[in-house]
Amino acid sequence: MAAELFKLTLEGESEILGLLTLTDFPGEFRMQIHLLCVSRDNQGKGKKYDGIAGSLIAFAARTATVKDFDQACISLLPKTELRAHYKSKYGMMDGGPQLFHEGARLQAIIKKYLP
């Protein structure tokens, strides 16, 4: 299973705001986020744009729901220092070493970041 790479840019611009890699696990109705990266200009208090990571997570959620509809799930294995951040800011749930979204939480993050 190869990961597929996606990039987030502003329409008509070439500057990459964020990157995401996804691997599909069809037997599990799950998309795994392997890489979730936000450009340096868009991190921390002085960031240029807000919501880059949320938009990438929402894109993964939408991709999963298009593929597996109501049984869809997305997951990621976060860096230790980001685990609490993903849970508090994006509402991700504990699934052992991984965090995940499924069901209504997938729809909520899509509505919030991809209106």
Predicted regions and their residues:
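Non-catalytic substrate-recognition and accessory regions of acyl/acetyltransferase enzymes
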Residues: 1-47, 59-74, 81-84, 88-115
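ATP phosphate-binding glycine-rich loop and adjacent ATP-lid/helix-beta elements
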Residues: 50-58
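Residue-level recognition of alpha-helix initiation/capping sites
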Residues: 55, 77-78
